[in-house]
Amino acid sequence: MALPSLGQDSWSLLRVFFFQLFLLPSLPPASGTGGQGPMPRVKYHAGDGHRALSFFQQKGLRDFDTLLLSDDGNTLYVGAREAVLALNIQNPGIPRLKNMIPWPASERKKTECAFKKKSNETQCFNFIRVLVSYNATHLYACGTFAFSPACTFIELQDSLLLPILIDKVMDGKGQSPFDPVHKHTAVLVDGMLYSGTMNNFLGSEPILMRTLGSQPVLKTDIFLRWLHADASFVAAIPSTQVVYFFFEETASEFDFFEELYISRVAQVCKNDVGGEKLLQKKWTTFLKAQLLCAQPGQLPFNIIRHAVLLPADSPSVSRIYAVFTSQWQVGGTRSSAVCAFSLTDIERVFKGKYKELNKETSRWTTYRGSEVSPRPGSCSMGPSSDKALTFMKDHFLMDEHVVGTPLLVKSGVEYTRLAVESARGLDGSSHVVMYLGTSTGSLHKAVVPQDSSAYLVEEIQLSPDSEPVRNLQLAPAQGAVFAGFSGGIWRVPRANCSVYESCVDCVLARDPHCAWDPESRLCSLLSGSTKPWKQDMERGNPEWVCTRGPMARSPRRQSPPQLIKEVLTVPNSILELPCPHLSALASYHWSHGRAKISEASATVYNGSLLLLPQDGVGGLYQCVATENGYSYPVVSYWVDSQDQPLALDPELAGVPRERVQVPLTRVGGGASMAAQRSYWPHFLIVTVLLAIVLLGVLTLLLASPLGALRARGKVQGCGMLPPREKAPLSRDQHLQPSKDHRTSASDVDADNNHLGAEVA
């Protein structure tokens, strides 16, 4: 960044002096975490050309909230406001619209919605909330339908959407929310739809419901209060015998001075058919337990935002990854966390003890009575007795909570959505890769090494308006992540390997999708070939892979420059040598020749080195980055003069050279004028101004003690006698004898003014 232009007189040097004296010490450090959790190594701002992105939008459409990937991975189905779209995502770049079918709310429903005091500009529409693949020929969709939920089947023909028939639209109550702002979830399992949403217009009746298929329709019982009235559902994940629902609600088992929100996981059995006499058309296998995501000794992250399942070869080792925030703000900022929960731990908790409500004390305690058979939530095939169902009605809350493993904790950010995949490195090890959408429209790519905490590879600002990410859909076959926003859909390639221009930078990135190809000398997407590519996911140290091996390893070794940029000095000017900060995790310093430039003596502005041409300033200047214990030159300059050229160091003879122009700032006249000019006036002016500054500082320091002394004097003067009257008011009045006046503390107001009240 170029400096402001300086004048042609002695004031030029004064401005340089004050620039160094006042501005440079106030600049923020180049890097550092500041206790906010892991920092993204690379950050891309909105519109940055170094990160290839593509954006799909359709005129007249808003709220691209619901995303569904086809079975072959080539089509992305999108549920927007009053429309369903089919996008072709086979080719890189902007997704291509295959076709679109409208599904607006009827005019009658919109009129009724407005009559109920809802906005006909933002609320009384059909927001698509459920979009699942029913079979090879049909999709199943549900929407808010102007606060009157509706569902329908959408026929497919060669992945194209056929128009919706009005007579095929069904009641969607219990499957889609009434209000578009209410959270919801739905999953299709074995032809049956399991949904969690709000079941009434007011949004005060949460429900878990099963519809479609051959099994009877089942739902939770609102009168038994299995769910709190403010329950908010975020995910539904099927397992072998059960379906898990993830949600948050106000806790009823804790006595707290304020409402405490708790994240939960609930289960229902797939083979549940309801009760015969008790709990007819109701779940008989409903259980719920608390989810705990917290660091030791810290407040828990108690509000769940999203959850996904990462399948494994064995279901017993599969894990659920969930995003949490906290209802408390520590340090005035929001925080987020990602925790992993084992399916084995969830199953163990649901096989443990129950809690029961003591009706006398209205407190939840551990149930210590005898077990009933069949055990509630056991998914037994036989019918349950009335005794077992009666027990189940009151014992639906588990005593133990499911403890998650914190993988990523970061303050100053609110994660809203999550997508997870497993990536295999060159060494064959598997690494969890998480894509995290934020409330400000950015996307974080995080990697979880084996038995370690996550680190952030990059941060990409998608939305220029900082609006939240509404949905994420991973498309592994296309190597991309799709992010839904109110105005459209962003396509984000899941890796950006080409931005790493050297083996050092490629290895330090520790991106499992990228590796260095020594033949093409490019950082490229990792393929299934067995080429001798370079990658170090475990250590991320270029000394092990970018050199000939561990024998060449040296703890103080610095790699040679790959390119030297030649710069010619100009008399009477300030030379600015820029240093691009490729990594936010590195620390940077400048060196001149083989010596490190002291930070105290160097003039560095925003990472750039400022040089005033004079004798001895020529030669090799390098901006050196140190990351993960490894130092490497980010940029190298050979500063030379036209009048007195320097000979290049023989060790740098084989390094390519390039003549470049760098920013210059004029500070004086010609060379001959500068040589004849005396700097005595400059010294006097600087000395006088510095004395004025010091005098002002001393005045400020002395002002506070003097003010305190004056205030003390006013307080001490409050006890003085008031002046006597010089003459009586009338002839009948006589002078009263003098009394000893004493003033109480209450006789002095906040401004040390005497109130005139006397105390005998």
Curated annotation (Swiss-Prot):
Compositional bias per record (Basic and acidic residues), positions renumbered to this chain: 723-744
Tissue specificity note: Expressed in neurons and glia in the developing hippocampus.
TM spans (from-to): 683-703
Membrane topology type: Single-pass type I membrane protein
Family assignment from sequence similarity: Belongs to the semaphorin family.
Pfam families: PSI, Sema
Glycosylation sites: N120, N135, N496, N606
Extracellular topological segments: 33-682
Superkingdom per UniProt: Eukaryota
Keyword Lipid metabolism in record: no
Residues spanning the signal sequence: 1-32
Species classification: Eukaryota, Metazoa, Chordata, Craniata, Vertebrata
Subunit and interaction comment: Interacts with PLXNB1, PLXNB2 and PLXNB3. Interacts with PLXND1. Interacts with TIMD2.
A GO CC annotation given for this chain: plasma membrane
Protein name as it appears in the record: Semaphorin-4A
Tagged with keyword Signal: yes
